[in-house]
Swiss-Prot record:
This is Fructose-1,6-bisphosphate aldolase/phosphatase. Mg(2+) 1 binds at D11, H18, D52, Q94. Residues 361-383 are annotated as: Disordered. Mg(2+) 3 binds at K231, D232, D233. The lineage of its organism: Archaea, Thermoproteota, Thermoprotei, Sulfolobales, Sulfolobaceae. It catalyses: beta-D-fructose 1,6-bisphosphate + H2O = beta-D-fructose 6-phosphate + phosphate; beta-D-fructose 1,6-bisphosphate = D-glyceraldehyde 3-phosphate + dihydroxyacetone phosphate. It comes from Metallosphaera sedula (strain ATCC 51363 / DSM 5348 / JCM 9185 / NBRC 15509 / TH2). Dihydroxyacetone phosphate binds at H18, K132, R265, D286. Transmembrane segments: none annotated. The active site is at D11 (proton acceptor), Y228 (proton donor/acceptor), K231 (schiff-base intermediate with dhap).
């Protein structure tokens, strides 16, 4: 059977600042999705949150970018936003960048990851959802899951994985993508995805039969809106087992609390902290950036689960290390490398401050202006 899993998220307002979704807004979204299930638009659904993001997980048979499915999600977010405004929640409707729905949600603010598959006899999946960071935050764990044999033993042991995987990498600034093969193009792949603010792993395919293995949301709100309107808070769907990473291999990729951009005001680097659903809320310095994982099985278009994947003492040390790194990074205050690099600050109010100070700068005769790099040009696209 062919079925689709759609994970669509948005920040529609939260309690006490950028902290946590209010249960009444989730109840409002639930009413919309329950009606869509009754009408047969979707077959099953699950609603959750990570931090201030409302997450809609829906299964159906309508394929990707289906108008009715996306309109259902839009209606759920709008109804939840109404409740947010009634309760006076913070940043009500923040991620909804348009006033009206127009066919599908692409470019309208919500983050979208959709996996359209021919179901295997057993179809286990993991859905990872992050708060206070951006889509490129999944570059490192996706590389480890699908290309690093030190993380994923199946790359060595499983014959169906031994040929490797294909990585579709998107340049979010130019709107262009390139497909790179692992292991033979591993170094070129790392050359791109090591700049996660620009190059994002969008999809991964098994090289042996071109079967899709993962999909990541790629919406970057500031690039859509032209200003800072909150971090993108990405979602990731990964297929598991039998020719794909085992569940334990997928989770192993998050055992190291690596640094990601986002955190406070979307302007700081901090460690990603994998947590249980009950701890999925932003606290210290609006973070540290949180990650939850839910495990499901898909059968005949319906969802069995979830399992709260990080609700386990095996990740206690990861969380402890993330807390130590949090403390270390915070001691830098407004200085880099805690604060993001200038190119990533362009969509904050920092350029306004610099413009205000411009008249006070004066030319120093004994200092030459830097020459442009010979390795870059005004047009950095790959035409």
């Amino acid at each position: 059977m062919r079925s689709t899993v759609s994970v669509i998220k948005a920040d529609i307002g939260s309690l006490a600042g950028h902290h946590v979704v209010h249960p009444d807004t989730m109840a409002a979204a639930n009413r919309v999705l329950a009606e869509a299930k009754r009408q047969g638009i979707i077959l099953d659904y699950y609603i959750t949150n990570v931090g201030d993001d409302l997450e809609l997980i829906m299964s159906h048979t309508r394929g990707e970018l289906d108008t009715k499915v996306h309109e259902t999600a839009w209606d759920a977010f709008k109804e939840a936003t109404k409740v947010s405004k009634e309760l006076g929640l913070y940043a009500a409707g923040q991620d909804l960048l348009s006033d009206s729905f127009s066919g599908n949600l692409k470019g309208m603010g919500p983050g979208i990851a959709e996996l359209d598959i021919e179901e295997r006899p057993s179809e286990p999946i993991a859905i990872f959802m992050a708060d206070k960071t951006e889509p490129g935050a999944f570059n490192l764990p996706l590389y480890k899951m699908f290309a690093d044999p030190f993380n994923t033993a199946g790359l060595v042991i499983d014959p169906t994985m031994n040929e490797g995987f294909k990585f579709e990498v998107l340049d979010v600034y130019e709107g262009q993508s390139v497909v790179l093969n692992s292991p033979e193009e591993m170094y070129s792949l790392l050359g791109l995805i090591g700049t996660p603010a620009r190059y994002v792993i969008r999809r991964v395919y098994r090289k042996a039969d071109n079967m899709i293995g993962s999909v990541t949301s790629i919406e970057r709100l500031n690039l859509i809106a032209g200003k800072y309107v909150g971090k993108d808070d990405p979602v990731l769907i990964v297929r598991l087992q039998h020719g794909f990473p085992a569940l334990g291999e997928a989770l192993e990729a998050f055992s190291f609390p690596y640094l990601v951009p986002g955190w406070m005001r979307g302007s700081h680097y901090g460690p990603i902290m994998p947590v249980s659903q009950r701890d999925a809320k932003a606290t210290r310095f609006d973070g540290p950036p949180r990650l939850i994982g839910l495990g499901f099985n898909v059968k005949n278009g319906k969802l069995t689960g979830p399992s709260d994947l990080f609700d386990d003492p095996a990740f206690d040390e990861t969380r402890r290390m993330a807390s130590v790194i949090t403390d270390y990074m915070r001691r830098h205050g407004p200085f880099m490398p805690h604060r993001l690099e200038p190119t990533e600050m362009e969509y904050t109010t920092l350029p306004t401050l610099i413009e205000k100070l411009k008249p006070r700068f004066k030319k120093e005769e004994d200092v030459k202006k830097a020459k442009p790099s010979v390795y870059t040009s005004k047009d950095q696209g790959m035409d």
